[in-house]
Amino acid sequence: MKYTIPGPNVKLFGRAVQTLTKIGDEVYVIADDRTLSLKAFSASRSSYMCFSFERSFFSTSELESEGYRGKLSARSSLLAFRSVQTLDRTVEECVVELTGDQALVSLRFRRGLTKRFWLPLIEYEELQFSFRADSYVRSVCGQAKLLSDVLANFAVNVPEVTLRLSPDRLDVFTHLEGADTQRSVRTSVSVQAAELDDLQCRGDAAELTVCLRGLRAALGFHEGLTVRLQLDEPGMPLVGRLDGVPGLEATYVAATLAAGGRPLASSVAPHERRPARQCADTTSKRHRAFLLGLTRPPLDEFTSQLPRDEQVFAEASDDEEG
């Protein structure tokens, strides 16, 4: 598999990689005859984001009939797209080549300079993320910048926020439990329906509590895009879609706190090497936080899964033509 990304789209591709590394520790690469998809799952497998690039996004593409599936560590993926702010002005094109054991990323700069990054693949794990949003009757649509500005009012150490959608406005406020409500500062931000592109709320107002970190990362992908958030009852996943770039589809799905301790409606089913976690029937704060990806495993579990005997190789060459 070989894909050539034109200069104006390199920045978007790099932003997608950076966004996925904020969601999870691994980037899944899946290619077929129609799209190249990059996916990431949170450590607790309770949130998910996918960028699907259609063939029109690339200037050229060389495909294989059997498709491609691979997995990269997030840390190694960042090496090739570290300075995305200047990529559209300095890079003429980016070539991504996928082979059986590695991914080769070539950045061809102006004046003939080429940088190459060999990113080794790690063991692939088949994951299936299931969710359905076709029956949702509540949604809010607006500019990603507006919603990002709303989330910017919350401190980085706030783990969860609650979204309340009513027929006339969207409220976002800090989620607190138990005795914390007596001693903690609570932030609330309201957006009137007139400030949004679209607001649909059939029936009563709905409140959903989600992880702030993942939602902030998804909305921060590109402030110029339009985002639509679909909501349902507590325990049903929040589904977000970003639109505005031809040939690119971005989807974010996050689990929400279940009412009455019911299991979360969205789940990931790994293959037999990593059994699916069982949701205990408890409403403890730690249990809820684990389901939303808010509790962190030991530090060594967050390090890259790059094999110790393999390294990411980078090379720069001056291919300037006479």
What positions do the PLM features span?
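DNA polymerase sliding clamps and clamp-related checkpoint/processivity subunits
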Residues: M1-T21, V27-L146, A152-N153, R164-G322
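Helix-loop-beta junctions that constitute the ligand-sensing/allosteric loops
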Residues: V158-E160
